Amino acid sequence: MPPVPPYSSPTPRRARTGRLSPTGVLQVDWPFFGELCRALALKVYHAYDPDLVLGIAKAGVIPGAVIASILQRDFASMAISRSESGARPVVIAGPPKLVTGRRVLVVDETCDTGDTMKLALAAVRDLKPAAVKTAVSFRTGPYAVDFHALETDSFIILPWDREIIVDGEIVMRPDYAEKLRANGE
């Protein structure tokens, strides 16, 4: 049987698979999200060999699980939340003890100020991993993570976060609908 050729994921491009409007809203669909995860996994693969991928709940669990699957590594999660918009993040559920002595990759969907990532890193480092690095799907601000798939200052609408149930009906999140209306979309 011939060897399987290596898979080379294309660099994510907004024009082909995601929609970046001239008004600054990036609507991410599932194919574009998959492309971002493949590109991010390749970056990690070439520079770091984690034993464990740790997703930050809620939204970081999704790219974290996909990247762990692509890299064929163990996956775990921790939860960090903000009680209200603009509030400082707090750890709701810390990382599992199995990070101790292992090479860990902490994954979130976006990173702007780094408040959430710094809190996650402190919680992970308290458990004495062998090494720890960070990755995000979207770098949206000044905080420098170790790996990111795409850098943007656009408002991001993710495919799993786009719709919610209101009065028994699935509808676009009202805040997203308002953002799109305000931007003429």
Task: Outline where the language-model segments fall.
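PRPP-associated nucleotide enzymes
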Residues: 1-185
